[in-house]
Amino acid sequence: MELRQLKYFVKTAETLNFSEAARALFVTQSTLSQQIRQLEQEMDTLLFERDSHSVQLTESGERLLPLAKRTLMDAVTCMDTVNDLKKMLSGSLNIGITYTFAPILTETVIAFTKAHPAVKLNIFYKTMEELMSMLEKRELDFVLSFKPSSVHPAIESHVLFDNNLSVIVNRYHPLAEKEKITLQDILPHGIAMPAKGLQSRNEFDKLYPSAYNQMKVRMELNEVNVLLDIVRGSSLITILSEAVIHQTNGLVAIPFDVPDNIMVGCVHTERGAYRKKAAEEFIRMLQESEAVRERAYNGLNK
């Protein structure tokens, strides 16, 4: 049995399509089929039920799939460990980040790639739940986001800074002079709302579970930078974390005046998992970055 065969098996099991799996693996379909057949012969069992219309896993295939995934992940961990023992910062680093955290990441990405050019960064922007699922499957080395409201026992969170859910307006907006804001304050104003699934929207729905139908929602978007551009150039307001506009010209953040309005910026890792030296170095640089230090300072001095 070879790791390559397990890799081919896993991709075919995920797609249930030999042609699609072969394309994803950059091999010919005949090569893929040959390796799968060889694996079945070595294990003396069929892993797939094939006919002219479909491909399905057999019971043996279903049993093998999670074990094969774990074996492939462990093989990657072995390589990372050996490289770390040689004190090499190389290989790849898979980072998950929610859309709201984008402004916080940029400074560290630039500094890290200059300091460690042998490390390839793979950065995935997705919703919180998608990222937590990828982290639990060990498809990511760590995730940057606010602390989720749901419980993930397999994941541990390391605090970077505290923040508040805020109303974001342009600096000429009638609300821009306020130090705190209430739900009643925003009801007369048109709103560009973050879409469901974004952490700011999740936090707002938690703080004000019945408010949405009272509000003048003109649009919903799942792209934070576009939301900010719309607010900067119009009379619309939006609702995001205060951290999003730190050192951004033309916009003002007014925190909601409501109990429990705390959004905790975190690095999330798999509990008990081996952490690459490259990941440790990236997180160290992130913690020391101006973007994080200033947010942490502002949180302590509110």
Question: What would you call each of these model-derived segments?
Answer:
Residues Q29-S30, Q34, D80, K86-H116, ...:
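N-terminal winged-helix
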Residues V10-T28:
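Short helix-boundary/capping micro-motifs
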Residues H152-H158, N163, N225-G272:
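Beta-alpha-beta core module
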Residues E42-M43, L64-K86:
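Alpha-helical linker/hinge and terminal dimerization helices associated
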Residues H189-A211, R275-I283, S289-L300:
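Secondary-structure junction motif
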Residues E40-E59:
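A short LG(V/I)-centered, amphipathic sequence patch enriched
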Residues L85, E107-A111, E129-L165, V169, ...:
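Short beta-strand-centered segments that line the small-molecule binding cleft or hinge
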Residues K87, A154-L165, V169-I191, R275-K276:
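Flexible hinge/capping segments at coil-to-helix
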